[in-house]
Amino acid sequence: MEEIRVNRLPAITWRYLHVNDSPDQFEFPGNSASAVFSDKRYVSEGGTLPTDFCGASAETLAAAEKGQAYTVIIPENTEAELTISITAEEDRPDFAGCFIFKLEKGAKLKLIWRLSGDRKHSVFATASSYELMENAVLSVSYLETGLPASSLYEQRYAVLGNEAKLDFVSAELGGEKVIVHSYGKLAGSRSEIRETALYAAAGSQSLDLFYHIDHIGKESNAVIDVKGALSDTAKKIFRGTLAVSYTHLRAHETLSDL
């Protein structure tokens, strides 16, 4: 286990405020569970993350890259549904892996992630990239349940073409420590990203949530909406950034953290 820094802000502020990043006691994943796909028609093994994929930290990204890699390509004008289930087991309590998604022009995908397990201690480190071509539509639901006393690192990167739409919905209900690092690039005109996260943390659970969306394409739209409840000594850290180029003043953005 080593101390690292995670979820550093893209533009740092005064260090004495202690908001630029977070300290984390990081443990590399050990024996890895398997990722189970509900449909393998569009799935192949292997793949490489984009070179500018940063992740929560260099260490957490390296951990994910040491695991198995999968590539999912949805062909042009194809509609598909896919569920990826990862369950911590007695002899394989951890998980590390990379997932590369590409939606070709006009493709649509409903993607569900399910992370679960009753192991008292697990480390999950995932890194997922999403490339949406023109008019592609992606809906992602992310559900964590169980996994007591576990550390969950969810790292993702998305690039959208013209009029592409991406909707992330996360239910952060499991894990002792949850770290989310999400970067989106609205590269195409009239592209849209919506990030919605719901959480309910109790006991000593902690959440460190990072969202950054760059507006590059004209008339792009972004929403970051985080809501939930804390009880006992549970805590949450939220870092959200919506960056708009001065040449694209018609971009629309909403940021909410409750």
For every predicted segment, state its role.
Residues 53-256:
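Conserved beta-strand/loop scaffold segments within soluble protein domains that form the structured core
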